[in-house]
A protein has these predicted regions:
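Bacterial N-terminal signal peptides that target proteins for export
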Residues: 1-9
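Short, low-complexity disordered leader/linker segments with a strong preference
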Residues: 2, 20-21
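C-terminal motif of bacterial Sec signal peptides marking the signal peptidase cleavage site
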Residues: 15-19
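Beta-strand-dominated extracellular/periplasmic modules and repeats
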Residues: 21-143
Length: 143
């Protein structure tokens, strides 16, 4: 009888767990681009050692707070290029603000906060036509 209860309990547990973990996020878009300032890649000292970083983030501009979109970020390479790969499947289509923070490793933004989340005027539409692929934002010129 005890063995039957243990087996029944284990079967119930496995049945409940069968519904967990199988959901994959909806497909999205990988987003890439290149940051330049004065015609040169946006860089900071010590980037090769990843002490200095140029952090790039996409923040959703919500028209519907329940649209399920969230922010995504990455670090730019020394040549100014970046690629944001969203939560396993890419960034969800919609309007986003692009934030750029150039930190040489001392916590100070060499861009003076001009392109931080609160101040950036860089806005992009991530197209539903690119779901499952990549959208290139091209050369993003910072002044």
């Amino acid at each position: 009888m005890c063995r039957f209860i243990v087996i029944l309990g284990l079967a119930a547990f496995l049945a409940l767990m069968g519904g967990c973990g199988g959901h994959k996020p909806d497909a999205g878009v990988n987003v890439k681009g290149k940051l330049t300032k004065g015609g040169q890649p946006v860089t900071v000292p010590n980037m090769a050692a990843r002490v200095g970083t140029v952090k790039v983030e996409l923040y959703p501009i919500h028209t519907d707070p329940n649209d399920g979109r969230s922010s995504f970020g990455t670090l730019a390479n020394e040549d100014g290029t970046f690629e944001i790969v969203g939560e396993g499947q890419g960034v969800k289509p919609g309007k986003y603000k692009l934030s750029v923070i150039a930190d040489p490793g001392d916590g100070q933004d060499q861009l003076g906060g001009k392109y931080g989340e609160a101040n950036s005027t860089l806005e992009f539409e991530i197209s539903a036509n690119n779901v499952g692929g990549t959208q290139n934002l091209g050369d993003i010129k910072l002044d």
